[in-house]
UniProtKB/Swiss-Prot annotation:
Note describing how the cofactor binds: Binds 1 [8Fe-7S] cluster per heterodimer.
Keyword Acetylation attributed: no
GO biological process, one term: nitrogen fixation
Protein name: Nitrogenase molybdenum-iron protein beta chain
Record keywords, A-Z: ATP-binding, Iron, Iron-sulfur, Metal-binding, Nitrogen fixation, Nucleotide-binding, Oxidoreductase
Binding-site residues for [8Fe-7S] cluster, renumbered to this chain: C77, C102, C159
A Gene Ontology term for the protein's cellular component: molybdenum-iron nitrogenase complex
Organism: Azospirillum brasilense
GO molecular function: ATP binding; iron-sulfur cluster binding; metal ion binding; nitrogenase activity
Higher taxonomy: Bacteria, Pseudomonadati, Pseudomonadota, Alphaproteobacteria, Rhodospirillales
Amino acid sequence: MSMSHPVSQSADKVIDHFTLFRQPEYKELFERKKTEFEYGPTPTKEVARVSAWTKTEEYKEKNLPVEAVVINPTKACQPIGAMLAAQGFEGTLPFVHGSQGCVSYYRTHLTRHFKEPNSAVSSSMTEDAAVFGGLNNMIDGLQRYALYKPKMIAVLTTCMAEVIGDDLSGFINNAKNKESVPADFPVPFAHTPAFVGSHIVGYDNMIKGVLTHFWGTSENFDTPKNETINLIPGFDGFAVGNNRELKRIAGLFGIQMTILSDVSDNFDTPADGEYRMYDGGTPLEATKEAVHAKATISMQEYCTPQSLQFIKREGPAGRQAYNYPMGVTGTDELLMKLAELSGKPSRGVKLERGRLVDAIADSHTHLHGKRFAVYGDPDFCLGMSKFLMELGAEPVHILSTSGSKKWEKQVQKVLDACRSASSGKAYGAKDLWHLRSLVFTDKVDYIIGNSYGKYLERDTKIPLIRLTYPIFDRHHHHRYPTWGYQGALNVLVRILDRIFEDMDANTNIVGETDYSFDLVR
């Protein structure tokens, strides 16, 4: 196709795509493709009219009850969560019973967030396996144990394997009978159908699967409890920083802690010339012995319900679940529980608390009365909302696609108990298209969420603060904790930086708005 404009790029002049697609020849090309290939292109005025209507109260009343379609949900699929959970155990190779394309997606999703490669294999199911079952794929696939030399293989499933009803337990036993792997080699499994639930359900299923494998084969559940405390982080995009912070805090208290699924090393390997297919992770022996711990703490109640129920039946008598404890109060509650269990309060932690309170006092005038929309996983939304209220801010719209009716009531109770947040409302089983209606009809100052919120930011012109998984378009946030007093300080700084950037952007026109373009904030 000919163009009326000369081509802007040549071998001697390579233009970055940011600039290239703004050149006249590309503008002309895009316009022509729209005219030729879009069936009956809608007039610009009609597009503008409908767009304006979708921002109204009338449209919101039609949009919020919609359940038959989901547009931009705040969740991913079960296998992603299961894969993350599996990679938190020593020398573990996730084995996805399904197609290669699916496992490529799961690996890519995690890699784009953590900026680290992650190892997983597939049983490479194709059309014949979909008809006759995937037993032979499982038998052949588990033989990769000899090539990759893991200490454990954790099996999860895709939609294909679940639709045809493959029996993982039976398949694994058959594979062991065929000597694909030694009979005593650990191969825990979890059924993780991607067409129901979410990544947090998949995480829960895999944690339960691993514990069932080790604890279900323990010889003596009546062994006296030891002084160890188990901790389950839950699905957490900041797991690298948060798990290390939890271990640091445990060290300050002198607590012997077993983190059940510790991905902090596996997703933060150094570039030192040594390739590590498996790095760090919870030792398998410690996982087996965790059944004898004095207590188990879950950092995310809504991310670990089945695991907690299993622990109630089989494991440590003491159980405590939190909702992504952030901020002063959230950290207070966690550390008081640790002090109670260990009998060892730490002065160092008290000093950290005082520094956080001082920082909040220094900056509270910039936070007081600011209105926020928060979306993400159920526990994150709860923890984040509580911290915002501590800062004097107002969480207005709290939304989670994975949120249940129970979660809605819990969030609403928290909001109603705070005068500054009493106008806030929780929305479970809703998506970002619903949130779009909410923020257009009931304005907020900032949105807290993940990278998918950037399209909402562009549409609504409301600044986005990225504080939860996945963060694809920013680098290395996951290395910094959001839990503990130090983590709360990191979150506070992240929020304040966005507020100050917004102030500068709105006061930088010389002679018009720069009267408040201040050097000191």
